[in-house]
Amino acid sequence: MKEMNICGINKNWVLPEAQENNVKKFLPRPLSRVNGWSPPLHSFQAISWITYLAMSIVTFGIFIPFLPYSWKYAANIVMGGVFIFHLIVHLIAITIDPADTNVRLKKDYTQPVPAFDRSKHTHVIQNQYCHLCEVTASKKAKHCSACNKCVSGFDHHCKWLNNCVGRRNYWFFFWSVASAAVGILGVMIILCYICIQYFVNPDELRTDPLYKEIISENTWLLFLSLWPVPVKTPIVLSIAVMALLLAIASFVMLGHLLIFHLYLITKNMSTFDYLMKTRFKKNLHPAEEKELPLQKKGDLPQEKSDNWAWPKSPPRVGSQKFPVSTLSPKSSVCFVASPPKICHSED
């Protein structure tokens, strides 16, 4: 029989907080991630690579060979250049370590990061010193909770790259998005031309010499340049429709993301600045919001004495004039799609 006290409470009952603290003591301390190739890899990486591979196969293996003979060379050169450029900048954006200079010079990525103790420190970074990385960080650096390190010129944590985007790889990220949008737009133009020509003048899609041996107009050749595969019209149309729908969905997301970053560039803001400024405005009264001056990049009320991308402790009464973030301990600024939002790093 359970032993109870006078209030009817089990004496062996443990407070949830104490239970949680006991569990945390036995959990291994996390390591910092070097770049987008560091485990754990993210499922969004697989989606992006599968999409890139699928678009490459259908574009160069199926649809460009349908174009008029004189257009094929131009299409292969232009689309090939865009796809190769995207691959290069995408790989660079993933591979670069965006950590702050002092972190890269001092940090041993094989060693676990110390746990943050709020009883000793109010914030992760104070007076430009990071208590987790144990280095003096640059002014615009933030400590990313997903990568568990200070990132120079922190913009956001990108799940598609599985890497933080900061000062060292921001422009590679930007050109990766821009080249992907241009490439997808090119695929959409080619697909629209093929669909229109199929109903208007299908002979324009059968200019390759190999079609002279094909008697049936309901038979089409895929992968003409490598290994011609004869298929019926419904198969070609099904592939074209699926590719077009995928291209449209990708272009909407990429276009939105590209426009958003063009806006940030014109305003000289980072994604992190934008999110914090938006959150700050939501917590203001209408009268106070009208009086809020236009702020420059990195000059936000929340960052007046602290640079962070880590959850802050609740403000003490009378010591904090501005609202602070209520991010959970495993949250970071991430891109799932555009616009950006606060999301859990383990999602």
Curated annotation (Swiss-Prot):
UniProt GO molecular function: protein-cysteine S-palmitoyltransferase activity
GO cellular component, one term: endosome membrane
Record's subcellular location: Endosome membrane
Record keywords: Acyltransferase, Endosome, Lipoprotein, Membrane, Palmitate, Transferase, Transmembrane, Transmembrane helix
Biased composition (Basic and acidic residues): 291-306
Lumenal face of the membrane: 68-75, 192-234
EC numbers: 2.3.1.225
Keyword Isomerase: no
Cytoplasmic face residues: 1-46, 97-170, 256-347
UniProt-listed GO biological process terms: antiviral innate immune response; peptidyl-L-cysteine S-palmitoylation; positive regulation of defense response to virus by host
Keyword Transmembrane included in the entry's annotation: yes
Compositionally biased spans, kind Polar residues: 322-331
Gene ablation phenotype (knockout): Homozygous knockout mice are viable and do not show overt phenotype. Composition and number of major immune cells is normal but mice are more susceptible to DNA-virus infection and death than their wild-type counterpart.
Source superkingdom: Eukaryota
Catalytic residues identified in the record: C158
Catalysed reactions, as listed in the record: L-cysteinyl-[protein] + hexadecanoyl-CoA = S-hexadecanoyl-L-cysteinyl-[protein] + CoA
Membrane-topology descriptor: Multi-pass membrane protein
UniProt-listed InterPro entries: Palmitoyltrfase_DHHC (IPR001594), PFA4/ZDH16/20/ERF2-like (IPR039859)
Main subcellular location of this protein, as a coarse class: membrane
Notes on the domains: The DHHC domain is required for palmitoyltransferase activity.
Its job: Endoplasmic reticulum-localized palmitoyltransferase that could catalyze the addition of palmitate onto various protein substrates and be involved in a variety of cellular processes. Has a palmitoyltransferase activity toward NCDN and regulates NCDN association with endosome membranes through this palmitoylation. May play a role in cell proliferation.
Quaternary structure annotation from Swiss-Prot or TrEMBL: Interacts with IRF3 and STING1; in presence of DNA viruses recruits IRF3 to STING1 promoting IRF3 phosphorylation and activation.
Record family assignment: Belongs to the DHHC palmitoyltransferase family.
Protein's UniProt name: Palmitoyltransferase ZDHHC11
Organism encoding this protein: Mus musculus
Gene: Zdhhc11
